Amino acid sequence: MYSKLHRPEKNELGVSVNAGSCVKLAHYLDKESGIGKFFFSQNQDSVPLTEVIQKIDNNKKTLKNNQDKFYMLSYNPSQREIAHLIKEVTGKDNVVALSSLTDKEIEKVVSEFQDYVRDCMDIYARNFNRNKDLSSEDLLWFGRVETERHYTYLDEEVKDGLRSKGDLKEGLQLHAHVIVSRMDVTQTISLSPLAKSMGNVNVLNGKAVKNGFSMKGWQVDCFQHFGNKYGYIANADERFYYHDSSYSSYKNKIQNKIIHEVMEDMKEERQFMTGARNITLILHPTKKSVKLYLKQKIKNILLENELVI
């Protein structure tokens, strides 16, 4: 499970696009239709698009014109985690596509994932360093569960001509986006997940207030909560995510694993390949063939281990 803060882009004037209305983002997230494809909140299962925009855009008291008014978060389970969630909800094992489920089963899976997102928004609130304990009830937010992902120009498959931009990605693609207001529901507390200065104190409306947000705390807690809530046992590579405090160390472990598996795989191919021509291709491959081989091998290793980065 990877929880992500999508950092705001800047416009041509260098001002964050999140300093304005959320209308473009809300309409973008409204793109999918079907079972369970509604905005939801802490206490509502279905919220109209117009209400989402109106409430987020009007919850900005004390914020300056150039300050972010909202943020987008996403909760992204691995395909292995999604399959586990489906089994917990429906009893069906080894599901590789939502199309194999009935409409009622899909509705149950989406509803359960919505509840998990609600839990994660509680976790998000708790990881702000404030004078009082916060919960999702203190936040103004709206979520949207999606079941599809599309290939973009950034994907290697598109760059290599194997897929076209806009093609649907295969497999289980369940995930959720959240629009969360920077201000709390009382419009007296500013909550920026970009603030890293845990423990600092600023003055807001004449009062001293603590600030800061623990990004790592939020991500790790959400990751662990999935396991606790659904009895999910993470594999070894997923456990690196919250046991290893050094990203460089984690990165090196993955790089070494990839190199080791690629070399072992090539040794096996040398043993089984016969004929002078095939041996020559392995010992003296073209740059293009090596590039394609390594890309596919690395992708397979990452998919097999369900990495959370």
Regions of interest found by a model, annotated:
Residues 1-309:
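N-terminal nicking endonuclease/strand-transfer module with a His-rich metal-binding environment
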